[in-house]
Curated annotation (Swiss-Prot):
This is Probable dolichyl pyrophosphate Man9GlcNAc2 alpha-1,3-glucosyltransferase. It comes from Caenorhabditis elegans. The lineage of its organism: Eukaryota, Metazoa, Ecdysozoa, Nematoda, Chromadorea. Belongs to the ALG6/ALG8 glucosyltransferase family. Residues 68-151, 203-211, 258-268, 354-359, 404-420, 465-474 are lumenal. Residues 1-46, 173-181, 233-239, 290-332, 380-382, 442-443, 496-503 are cytoplasmic. GO terms for molecular function: dolichyl pyrophosphate Man9GlcNAc2 alpha-1,3-glucosyltransferase activity.
Length: 503
C-alpha cells in the first residue's frame, strides 16, 4: 500500500453511479438496431403486393410509350388497328352484320374473328370512343386513324382490364400460398411476355386469361358452377381458351363422380351441364335470333388459314424445312388433332385418376403447350396460354418454370422486332438476370441455353442479312424455342406420373 502511495502515477479512482432508470435507457438505446422489414413475413404480403404493383404500372406505362403493332404502316396497319376497327364496326352496324362481309364491313380488312364477348367488349369501347371523339370510330373513314389522344385511350383500355380481370385471381393465389416467396411472386406478376404483347403489340389477352385464372380459383375451391360459367365467358372472349378446355372438363368430371353415389354424381354433372349450356345460349342469343350464328362460327374457326402465322415456335413452323417435303396437305388437320391429343393425354389421364390441384396446374400447362406446338392456326401470342398456368407452378417447379418463362420471352422477340420494339430485349434480359440472381437452384445448363437464345435475338437485330434465307434468324429462334417447348411438355408429362407414384 505504501509503495502505491509513493508512486506518483497512481491516483484514487472514483466511480460515478448512474441513476438505474437512466442507465437502462442508455443500454437500450445502444442495443437498439435499425428495423429491417422482412418481406418474406406473411404479415407483409400487402406491402410486397403494393411494391410490385407500383413497379408493374411503371413498366406498363413505359412499354405503352413504344410503337404498337402496324403503327404508321398502311394499308393494313396491325393488331392495334384491328381492335379499333372492331369498335368502328360494332358501334356503327347492326349486330347481324358484325361477322358478315358487306359494303361497310370488308372481312378482308380485319374482319371480326373472335367470339361474341369480344364483340360486345369492343362495342362498349366503341360507344365510349364515339362519345369522346366521333372521328375515332367513323364508319370507313376512320381506317388507320392515329393520334396521341386516341393512343392514350387505347393504351388505357388495355391496362385497366389487366387490373380488373387478370391481377385479382393471380394475387389471391399467391398471397394464400404457403410456399409464396416475394421474389417468385414478383416474377409471376411482372412476367414480360404478357405485358409486351398487351401493352406494346396491343391486345386484350389479360381479359380471357384473367377469366381463366378466376375459373381455376373457383373450381379448386369447389365453386364448380361459378367456375364453369367463368370458363364459358373466357372461351367466348377468345376461342384459344380451348387450349384449357380439356383439363377443365376432366377436372370437373373427375371431381363430380362419386362411385358410392352414382345418382348424385349424375345429377351434379347434369346441373353443371345445364348452367354451361344456358350461359352459351345467353351469350349467343343475339346471333341465334338473327340467324347469323353459323357465320360467327366460320369466322371464329378459320381452318382455311393454315397451321401457323409468321415464324412461330410451333412444331409445324420450326420443322417446316422437313415437313414441307412431305405430302401432308390433305391430312394435316387430322395429324394436327392426333398430335394435340397425344401430347395432352398423359397429364389428362393422371388428372382424371387423381384430380388434385397440383395435377390440375400441371395438366393446364402441358395441354396448353401441346396445343401451341401441334394445333391449327397458331400465333406467337398463344404461348401465353401455356405460360400463365405455368406461373401457378412456380413454387413447386421453380427451376423449370423460370427457365420456361425466359424461353417464352425469347420466342416472341421476332414479333417485337416486327413492331419496331426491339427495346423489349432489354426488358427480357433484365427479367432473366433478376430471375437467376435471386432464386435457387441455378442450373448452369439453363442459363447457357437462355444466353444462346439471347444471342439469336441479337443476331436478328445486327447479324448479316442472307438473301437466300431472309428469315434465317427468325426461323432459328422458332426452332430453338420449339425444341425447348417439346422438352417442357415431356417433362411435365413424366412429372404427372411421378406424382401418381408418390400418392
Amino acid at each position: 500500500m505504501k509503495e502505491r502511495i509513493k508512486d506518483k502515477a497512481w491516483r484514487p479512482q472514483f466511480i460515478k453511479l448512474n441513476n438505474p432508470d437512466t442507465s437502462k435507457k442508455i443500454v437500450s438505446q445502444k442495443s437498439k438496431k435499425p428495423e429491417i422489414v422482412d418481406l418474406s413475413s406473411p404479415g407483409n404480403n400487402d406491402l410486397v403486393t403494393i411494391s410490385i404493383l407500383c413497379v408493374l404500372l411503371c413498366f406498363q406505362l413505359a412499354i405503352s410509350l413504344n410503337p404498337h403493332s402496324g403503327e404508321s404502316q398502311p394499308p393494313m396497319y396491325g393488331d392495334y388497328e384491328a381492335q379499333r376497327h372492331w369498335m368502328e364496326i360494332t358501334v356503327n352496324l347492326p349486330i347481324e352484320q358484325w361477322y358478315l362481309n358487306g359494303t361497310h364491313n370488308d372481312l378482308l380488312y380485319w374482319g371480326l374473328d373472335y367470339p361474341p364477348i369480344t364483340a360486345y367488349h369492343h362495342y362498349l369501347l366503341g360507344v365510349i370512343s364515339n362519345k369522346i371523339n366521333k372521328k375515332w370510330v367513323e364508319l370507313t373513314t376512320s381506317r388507320g386513324y392515329e393520334s396521341i389522344a386516341h393512343k392514350l385511350f387505347m393504351r388505357l383500355s388495355a391496362i385497366i382490364p389487366f387490373y380488373i380481370f387478370y391481377l385479382p385471381p393471380l394475387i389471391f393465389y399467391f398471397t394464400r400460398s404457403k410456399k409464396m416467396s416475394p421474389i417468385l411472386y414478383a416474377l409471376a406478376l411482372l412476367y414480360p411476355s404478357l405485358l409486351v404483347i398487351d401493352n406494346g403489340h396491343f391486345q386484350y389477352n389479360s381479359i380471357s386469361l384473367g377469366l381463366f385464372l378466376a375459373t381455376y380459383m373457383f373450381l379448386t375451391k369447389n365453386f364448380t358452377i361459378i367456375g364453369s360459367i367463368l370458363f364459358v365467358a373466357a372461351l367466348n372472349y377468345k376461342q384459344m381458351e380451348l387450349y384449357h378446355a380439356l383439363p377443365v372438363f376432366v377436372f370437373i368430371l373427375a371431381r363430380s363422380i362419386n362411385k358410392t353415389q352414382l345418382f348424385n354424381s349424375f345429377r351434379r354433372i347434369l346441373t353443371i351441364g345445364l348452367f354451361v349450356v344456358g350461359t352459351f345460349l345467353i351469350i349467343w342469343l343475339p346471333f341465334l335470333l338473327t340467324g347469323t350464328a353459323k357465320d360467327v362460327i366460320i369466322r371464329v374457326f378459320p381452318f382455311n388459314r393454315g397451321l401457323y402465322e409468321d415464324k412461330v415456335a410451333s412444331f409445324w413452323c420450326a420443322f417446316s424445312f422437313i415437313l414441307k417435303r412431305l405430302p401432308l396437305q390433305s391430312v394435316q388437320i387430322y395429324i394436327s388433332t392426333a398430335l394435340v391429343l397425344a401430347g395432352s393425354a398423359p397429364s389428362l389421364l393422371v388428372l382424371f385418376l387423381r384430380p388434385t390441384e397440383k395435377q390440375f396446374r400441371i395438366s393446364l400447362t402441358a395441354t396448353g403447350l401441346s396445343f401451341f406446338l401441334f394445333s391449327f392456326h397458331v400465333h406467337e401470342k398463344t404461348i401465353l396460354l401455356a405460360a400463365v398456368p405455368a406461373l401457378l407452378l412456380i413454387s413447386e417447379y421453380t427451376s423449370l418454370v423460370i427457365w420456361f418463362l425466359n424461353i417464352t420471352n425469347i420466342s416472341i422477340f421476332s414479333l417485337c422486332v416486327k413492331d419496331n420494339f426491339a427495346l423489349s430485349l432489354s426488358f427480357f434480359f433484365a427479367y432473366f438476370v433478376v430471375s437467376y440472381a435471386y432464386t435457387a437452384p441455378r442450373k448452369i445448363s439453363h442459363i447457357l441455353t437462355i444466353l444462346i437464345g439471347f444471342a439469336i435475338c441479337i443476331l436478328e437485330l445486327y447479324g448479316p442479312s442472307n438473301q437466300r434465307f431472309p428469315h434465317i434468324y427468325q426461323l432459328a429462334n422458332a426452332f430453338f424455342s420449339c425444341v425447348h417447348f417439346i422438352y417442357f411438355l415431356l417433362y411435365l408429362s413424366f412429372a404427372s406420373f411421378e406424382k401418381t407414384k408418390k400418392e
